From Swiss-Prot:
Annotated substrate binding sites: K150
GO cellular component, one term: cytosol
The name this protein goes by in its record: Phosphoglycolate phosphatase
UniProt keyword Hydrolase present: yes
Cofactor(s), by name: Mg(2+)
Functional description taken from the UniProt entry: Catalyzes the dephosphorylation of 2-phosphoglycolate.
Enzyme active site: D8 (nucleophile)
Pfam families given in the database record: Hydrolase_3 (PF08282)
Source organism of this protein record: Sulfolobus acidocaldarius (strain ATCC 33909 / DSM 639 / JCM 8929 / NBRC 15157 / NCIMB 11770)
Keywords (A to Z) from UniProt: Carbohydrate metabolism, Hydrolase, Magnesium, Metal-binding
Length: 227
C-alpha cells in the first residue's frame, strides 16, 4: 500500500526539463492524492528555503529533502544529514574554473551548485583532492561531501515517517535521481528522463515531466496502482 509519494522538482513537476514553470495540473492531482491519505514530499537539489516555500504553498505534508539529500524536514523537525562544505572552497572553485554559482548558494550549507552544468576532468580531480564529491545533474554542477546524494536524505525521511521502503513511491527525471529511487519501493520515471534512470524504473511513463506525474497519479487515484 502506498503511504508516501516523493517527487523531484526540476524536470519532474515542471512542464519540461528546460523550464522552471511548474505544471499546476500535477500539483493539483498530488493535492487530491493527499486527501486520500497518501502524503506527498519534495526531493531536490534546490535549497531548503525554496523547497519549503513550494511545499507550503502546494499544501503538501510528506516532508522535504533539500540540497540533494543533505537537509531533511518533516513534522516540524529539520535535520542536516551531511557534513557542511567550507565557503572558502566554494569561492576557490568559482575562481579556479570560471563558473558561476547559483543564486541559491547563499541559502545552502552542504550542497552547492554552479553553471554551466558541464563537468570537466580537472574539476573532478580538484574535488577529489579537497575531499569533495562532484557531479552534474544536467541543470548544474553540484559539489558536496555526500557520496550517496539524495539517497541519504530520502532514507532519513522514510525513517522519520516510520515506513518501509515498499510503501514509498519516488518520481524523478535525472541520473542524479538514481540513488533516490533505489531507496523507494516503486520507481516512477518521466518519459523524457535520462536513459540511465529509465533503466531502473518500475514505471516509465509515456508523458514527459509534469504530465508524466499526472499520468501516474491518475492511476493511483483510480486504484489501478496502490498495492
Amino acid at each position: 500500500m502506498i503511504r508516501l509519494i516523493l517527487t523531484d522538482v526540476d524536470g519532474t513537476l515542471t512542464f519540461d526539463r528546460d523550464t522552471y514553470n511548474i505544471d499546476l495540473d500535477a500539483v493539483d492531482l498530488l493535492r487530491k492524492v493527499e486527501k486520500k491519505g497518501i502524503k506527498v514530499g519534495l526531493v531536490s537539489g534546490n535549497s531548503y528555503p525554496v523547497l519549503r516555500a513550494l511545499y507550503t504553498y502546494f499544501g503538501f505534508n510528506g516532508g522535504i529533502v533539500a540540497e540533494n539529500g543533505c537537509i531533511v524536514y518533516y513534522d516540524n523537525q529539520l535535520k542536516e544529514v551531511c557534513e557542511r562544505v567550507e565557503r572558502s572552497l566554494i569561492s576557490e572553485f568559482e575562481n579556479r574554473f570560471g563558473v558561476k554559482g547559483s543564486w541559491q548558494n547563499q541559502f545552502k550549507v552542504c550542497d552547492f551548485s554552479f553553471y554551466p552544468p558541464i563537468l570537466k576532468d580537472e574539476m573532478v580531480k580538484w574535488a577529489l583532492d579537497k575531499g569533495l564529491y562532484i557531479k552534474t545533474s544536467g541543470y548544474a554542477v553540484h559539489i558536496s561531501k555526500s557520496k550517496r546524494g539524495k539517497a541519504e536524505g530520502v532514507r532519513e525521511l522514510i525513517k522519520m515517517h516510520g515506513l518501509d521502503k515498499a510503501e514509498v513511491v519516488g518520481i524523478g527525471d535525472s541520473s542524479t535521481d538514481i540513488e533516490f529511487l533505489e531507496e523507494v519501493g516503486i520507481r516512477v520515471v518521466v518519459g523524457n528522463a535520462d536513459e540511465s534512470l529509465k533503466s531502473i524504473g518500475d514505471f516509465v511513463m509515456r508523458e514527459k515531466s509534469g504530465k508524466a506525474v499526472v499520468e501516474f497519479i491518475k492511476k493511483v487515484i483510480t486504484g489501478e496502482i496502490n498495492e
